[in-house]
Amino acid sequence: MTTPKNVQVSEKTLEITQIKSTIGGKQNQRDTLRSLGLKRIGHTVVRKADAVTVGMINTIPHLVKVEEAK
């Protein structure tokens, strides 16, 4: 497992899983999760590790778990 703050831009594919709720969170954090395609706790999406995705992950590291896709 990679900690969200250690994610680097690369050609790799990432599995991003929401692990915490957005209740009580800021609107920009909810918007970031929605932009990544995450809708609920335990939901996982697969994205390329480009600059946009890594930037979004870095704004919400406490809400997601990031792993390299197999």
UniProtKB/Swiss-Prot annotation:
Disulphide bridges: none
Ribosomal protein listed as a keyword: yes
InterPro entries found in the cross-reference section: Ribo_uL30_ferredoxin-like_sf, Ribosomal_uL30_bac-type, Ribosomal_uL30_CS, Ribosomal_uL30_ferredoxin-like
Stored PROSITE patterns: RIBOSOMAL_L30
Any GO CC annotation of this UniProt entry: cytosolic large ribosomal subunit
Keywords tagged on the record: Ribonucleoprotein, Ribosomal protein
GO molecular-function terms, A-Z: structural constituent of ribosome
Keyword match Ribosomal protein: yes
Taxonomic superkingdom: Bacteria
A Gene Ontology biological process term: translation
Alphabetized SUPFAM superfamilies for the sequence: Ribosomal protein L30p/L7e
Assigned protein family: Belongs to the universal ribosomal protein uL30 family.
Record HAMAP family: Ribosomal_uL30_B (MF_01371_B)
Quaternary structure and partners: Part of the 50S ribosomal subunit.
Protein name from the UniProt record: Large ribosomal subunit protein uL30
Organism: Renibacterium salmoninarum (strain ATCC 33209 / DSM 20767 / JCM 11484 / NBRC 15589 / NCIMB 2235)
